[in-house]
Structure formats: structure tokens, C-alpha cells
Amino acid sequence: MALIQTSLIWVAYAVAVAILFLIASTFVYVYQKPRDRAAAVTIVCIFTTLALLATVLLIPVDVALVSSTSRSSLGRKKDWATPDKVDSIVYTLRIVYYTLYSLDAVLCLLVIPFTYFWYEEYDQDAAEHGEQTAAQRIGGALKWTLGFLIFVVAIFLVGFFVPFAKQAKEDKRLDLDYFKHLLSENHGERALSFGLGFLITVGTVLFVLYTGAGMALLPVAMIKSAPSVSAPTLAANTASQLETNRERQRQLEGRNEGREGGLDSRDRRELEALVREERTLIRRERLAAESSGEDRHWIVKAWIKTEAFFRPLKLIGGLILLVFALVIFASMLITGIDKAKNSICGAHCGYILGHINIFQPLNWVLVKSAKVFPIDYVLFLLLVLFLFSASVVGIATAGIRFLWVTIFKIRKGQTSPQALLMATVLLTLITLAINYSVAMVVAPQYATWGPQTYCDMKTNSLDEQPDCAEHKDLIKPCSELATNPAAQQVCTPSVLSTFINRVTINFPFFGIVLFWAQFAFLGVYLIVFLTTLFKAPTLDQEQIDRDLEEEEDEGLLASTGRRFGAAWSDVTGRATKPANYGATERDERIQ
């Protein structure tokens, strides 16, 4: 029975990873620029996105496996859950966590930088003339990657050793053996804890800025946005206008053919205006083709059809996401206040909370649903995907910046390979921060103990399990503050919570920064949310979809189609009756 239950949990995780693969592929194909697509960049971005999402979605598996060793209805261990069996489950989870975290670090710090520099090293002219070989390109990429890696390792070593250097100097132990001992302590777990804490802290800064803004923008943008004219109708109207424009140009040129001095001033001005309009219409024609998925990957076409089909439900979906975002905001605020007020050790250990003192809605829902796996897994998947989508929206809105300078812009169908790689790095770091935030702030009881309970009765011996079958009122949720020895025998904390607590206890600075950054996240969310309520959202997703050129005239891309008509045209791929918008009365008379 235990093997079947454990196997089902891992099967559910495998199914979730398969779903994540589709989501990661869709994300990459929707945002990348088709004309600049590179197979290596696409594969690296998809695999990295899959790995980082799989890391976060290991939390419900962790909770389900450690919780499967006990009966929450009786507050006691199951008969098969011997200490050796429990240790085996925890050891397996620890290996999976180490593997995924190491994979995320290698992808973020080694593979993506190499791919970025490899793409940057490409010189089309030199390659066409045989002056640049694959070996030269790889050598240049390796050189830059090695330099970047040395820089990162230097920061890591300085950050790791400096806090201990002062104490070692006072104790007169400032030698090489002492620092070797620090690195190898607990088989290197202390060094790994520092590395994980460092990456989470960097990711938290991005989490505050991008995810905080994106969580406010995403629902409001969905509510306020209206679908533009459908892509098929836009293409049909543009073709009609383009034909009229060119016919008028031919008439002007034919009327003045052979005329001494060429066109008169009035006709010349009109012809120049027609030429400018023709260029704009050609851009719009190409834009309509790309928006409808022409010559795009089948994943992009499927995404466009799905988006168009559900477009009329955007308002309802936006309202649901708005409520969900507010619940997350309230849950994080409640936990933050609870930790600041009732933490068992305060800043010395990163504000670890012994047990929930204030009712927290999201944590309560996840704990209750965890009793029937995989309901909690589905809810947790939706939570993670919402925060991930909010991060994408935040990055798409602000772009990739250094201070006030925009380095890259992230747009659907218009993102360069370099920008896509940089965005993937940011999302990797943000996802590590989401890992901390979900486990320690959004749902701390769920992520630490799940639905585990213990029987708070005294027993005659330490090896005997108390029986609360007749005393249900003595069954209590597992807590770090439990004093009954039975709690230590029954309650098994999740592996992730152990990792994070080790980081915040060994390196209190990380714990302080990570905890107070959650309030900064709430502040950014509140500011952006209130701003978008009284002002048009800065992110217009439909406009971004159609913004092919920076100099595109805004008037030519106005939303003129009907809401449901545009959606149905995009689904069927057929245009409604073309409208002669943009044509002048004079053009109509000439026709």
C-alpha cells in the first residue's frame, strides 16, 4: 500500500512535468522572434524554464510524501512508516532537490551564458566568406563564459568567507585549513546553503520589482483590455486599402506622365502621403500575417487560436485573477505580521514561525486539500503558474533594465534570442524567490508539515504511540513548538523547509533580507494596483502583439472590431466583410 501511494505521488509529478513542458514550449515560441530563431537558444530556454518550474512543483510532492507516513485523522505514524522508511523517503527527496537546484545553477550560471556568448560571437559576413569557423565561435564563447564564471565564483567566495574571517582572526585560526573546513563542513552543505541563499536573495530583488508589479498588472490588464480587430479581418482590410492606395498612385503618375516639370505641388504632396501610407500598410499587412500565425510554429498557431477562443471570457478571468491576487496579498500580509510579532527567534534565524497564530486563508485551503491528494497539487500548480505569469508580465512591461536604461524589451513574437536568454535567467532567479515566498510566507504550515497532526497525550514509554481515537480534541497540527515527545516521533518536516531554515539560521543576513523583502513586494503590488485602477494600464497586451515597429502609427492599429466578432474571426481564420476604413471619399469616387 505504501509503495502504491508513493508511486502515485511520483506519477502525478511526472504528469505535472509533462504539462510544464508544454507551458515552457508555448512561452518560448510565443515570445521569440521567428526570423531570428536559433535552435540552440530555443532548446536551452525551454529546458531551463521546465527545470525551474519543476523545482517549485516539487514542494507538493515533498509535502505529500512526508505526510503519507502518518494518519492525520488519528495523529500517529502508519504501521509501515518505520524510522528507516521515513529516512529513505527524506533521503530520496534530498537527492532530487540537490539535483534540481544544481541543474538550475548550472543552467543559469554556465549553460545560458555560454549560449548567449555563442550567439553573440556569430558574424554573418565572416561566416559566409569562410572567415569564421565553428571552433572559433565556440572558443570565443568559452572565453567569455569562463570570465563570467570566475566573476561569479569570486563574489561567492568573498560573500562566504568574509563573515567568518573576523571571528577566525580573533580566534587566531586564520589559515587555509580553517577555510577548507568551512567548505567541507557537513559534506559541503554549508557552502551549498550559502550558494542557495545568495541566489534566492538576488532573485528576491527581481521578485519584488517584476512579480510584484506583474501580479497587479495581469488581472487589471485583462479586465480593461478589449480585443482589437481580428487578424483575418485586419489582413483583408489592409489588402483592400493597399490596392486602393496603389491604384491612386498609378492614376496620379499616369495623369502627369509626359508633363513638363513633372507633378505639380498638390499632386506631389498627395503622392508623398500615399507612399508613406503604403509603407505603413505593408508593415500592417506583415503584422496581420504574423498575428494570425502565418509561417509560425504549430505551437504558436494553437496558442493564437486558444487565446482567440477564450477572448470573450477575459473579463471574467481578469476578475477571478484579481480576487486570487488579493487573497495572496492578504495571506502574505497576515503571515508577515504573524512572523514579525510571534517568531520564536526573530532576526537571529530569519523569523521562523513556530505555528500559525492568525487565520491565513490560502494556507488553510492548501492544508485541508492536502488530505486528498492531488487536489492540493492542482491548487499549488495554479498558484505557481499565476506567479510565473505575473513575473512574465512584469518583465514584459518594464523590460530588462539596468537602473533606468532599458537593455532588452520582451514582446510577443518580437523578442530577440539574447533578450529571451536574459529573460530566462531572470525567471530562474525569480522562481527561486517564489520557492522561498510560497514555502515561508504564502503557505508556511502547508509547506512545512502539510496536514500532519500528532496526538497530544502522555504515554508510559517513549516508544509507545499515544492513541487519540477516543480523544479527538487532543489531535493537534504539527508544530515546531510542540513539547510532547510524540510530536517528534510523528511529525516529519518537509525537506524544502529544512533547506530554507538551514540557510536562514546559518546566514541570518539572508533571512532578514528575504523576510522584509516580502513587505516590499506587497508595497510594490499595492502601488501598481492602485495606479492601474485609476489610470489606463501601462501594459496593453493586444497592442504589444501588433506593435511590429517602434514608429508604427497608433491610429492604424486602433481597436475597431466588435468584441465577439473579432474573437470568432480569429478562431475560424475567416474575415468578416472588409470595411473601407482609412479610405478617403476621393479614393472611393476614383474607384
From Swiss-Prot:
Chief place where the protein resides: membrane
UniProtKB keywords: Cobalamin, Cobalt, Lysosome, Membrane, Transmembrane, Transmembrane helix, Transport
Membrane-crossing residue ranges in chain numbering: 8-28, 39-59, 95-115, 144-164, 198-218, 315-335, 378-398, 422-442, 509-529
Residue numbers spanned by region Disordered: 238-266
Any single GO CC term annotated in Swiss-Prot or TrEMBL for this entry: vacuolar membrane
Subcellular location: Lysosome membrane
One Pfam match: LMBR1
GO annotation (BP), single: protein localization to vacuole
Top-level division of the source organism's lineage: Eukaryota
Gene Ontology MF annotations: cobalamin binding
Basic and acidic residues biased stretches: 244-266
Membrane topology: Multi-pass membrane protein
DNA-binding is among the record's keywords: no
InterPro entries for this protein: LMBD1_LysCbl_Transport (IPR050854), LMBR1-like_membr_prot (IPR006876)
Function: Probable lysosomal cobalamin transporter. Required to export cobalamin from lysosomes allowing its conversion to cofactors.
Matches recorded under PANTHER family: LYSOSOMAL COBALAMIN TRANSPORT ESCORT PROTEIN LMBD1, LYSOSOMAL COBALAMIN TRANSPORTER-RELATED
Protein family per UniProt: Belongs to the LIMR family. LMBRD1 subfamily.
Name listed for the protein in its UniProt record: Probable lysosomal cobalamin transporter
Gene source species: Pyrenophora tritici-repentis (strain Pt-1C-BFP)
Phylogenetic placement of the source organism: Eukaryota, Fungi, Dikarya, Ascomycota, Pezizomycotina
